[in-house]
């Protein structure tokens, strides 16, 4: 993907090769993957060079693409970008240009004649009298996909091993979703599948230089919250410590991706994902290589940019894309006025969750290097310590919680969000900061159905009143690490009760939950509520293991709804 021009304050120099990277006075040239260790092929992985990646749908057939998205032929803007062109997209687009002004031209019929539709993931052909845990175990095969080869012109990226998709409209693997899914796979005894998913992500790093948002061409310009080191840690718990050495090359490449472009930054400048603060501290932000509307949400993005009268549309598009990379798409955390999407400024924010995850990556790299007996262990440990110091200096609010920092205005957020618990999850918080954060979270975010994402009602899906499975697990695991078992149990049991109540009523697990007493699915966002659902399944199994209350594991009431056959 081409790099877009820099905005003011961004030092967008050409990216240096990973071997030439330097940071905080420490030369990484000795221990970034291409220099230190040859990336040996993983067992069973596809090692031949992949076919050239086709252009994204908005570039492959631009006029047709815009006509379909602008005309709202489908309720969900993602639907069309997942369609398979039945012949050369350039020829399809040329035919569209030649025909679309003719009398009687029918755009929908033209699309139907030239594309194959991708159906949603079906998960409703499971017996209606299964208990929750049994239902989840039965769901895994429904969510598994194997795509070692893809048809020409598809937006899907091939992967060497089977993988689990979230469900519904999400027909591909997603980066940060997959960690929480893998937790459940391991708990279900599906350790081979969990290992295969980890190997898929290692393959993506080796092939594309990073783990994209998902295995689609239109996701390649960005990543998602970097959970690869947590996946390696999870697999080490299954196979043993040798796992760290096996994935060291990919861990190093992952780190190089997130730190790329940070060379020679002056205080107050940013490049790609890297920000150098006014005091010289180096932290990270979310970012995307492209500054155009997201193909999977094209109409939403163009309308949002049109409402931002005082900003270049390209800036709005990049901030929307960066918000998608954050996983929190969207939330008041990224909005200048705290409520209006057109004020989004994601790239101006140094997020507490992202930097906690990168601290864990640095610590994992130090551990992996220690297994090789190389000096890079001390170097990565030093980088982790410097990041911790920068987090304590800039992302700790004296009111008693971790928060996001706006590097452009040099202001710390006064908003308590579920992201405040990531430093506990990563193990970087001091005992005092952990205790004070727990107190703040209990006072501001505890709800009848679990942990609220934020305390603001904006209509965005990563705000009040929604609760999300991954954030419940980050909270529960992080709080337990620091002895806050009571609050952890309260959050975990309340969320389990919410999951069980909706399951008993509708026999499904969903992407997000409302946290009110009525135990409904969550709302807001750019698309309808999805069921399946990968990360909810995984977190539910983890919570059931910790808090196995009878009400959370009994079978739901029988329903008269007749199950439909599964899609092929």
From Swiss-Prot:
Q: What is its EC number?
A: 3.2.1.28
* Catalytic activity field: alpha,alpha-trehalose + H2O = alpha-D-glucose + beta-D-glucose
Q: Mark the transmembrane ranges.
A: none
GO molecular function annotation? alpha,alpha-trehalase activity
- List the active-site residues: 329 (proton donor/acceptor), 511 (proton donor/acceptor)
Residue sites binding substrate per the record? 169, 176-177, 213, 222-224, 294-296, 327, 526
Give the matching Pfam families. Trehalase (PF01204)
Instruction: Indicate the principal place this protein occupies in or around the cell.
Output: periplasm
What start and end residues bound the annotated signal peptide? 1-38
- PROSITE patterns per record: TREHALASE_1, TREHALASE_2
**SUPFAM superfamilies reported for this sequence:** Six-hairpin glycosidases (SSF48208)
Gene Ontology annotations of biological process type: cellular hyperosmotic response; trehalose catabolic process
**Keywords linked to the UniProt accession:** Glycosidase, Hydrolase, Periplasm, Signal
Q: Where is the protein situated, by its record's location annotation? A: Periplasm
Primary enzyme class: hydrolase
Cellular component annotations (GO), alphabetically ordered:
periplasmic space
Q: Which HAMAP family match?
A: Peripl_trehalase
Family from the record: Belongs to the glycosyl hydrolase 37 family.
What is this protein's record name? Answer: Periplasmic trehalase
What organism is recorded for this protein?
A: Xanthomonas campestris pv. campestris (strain B100)
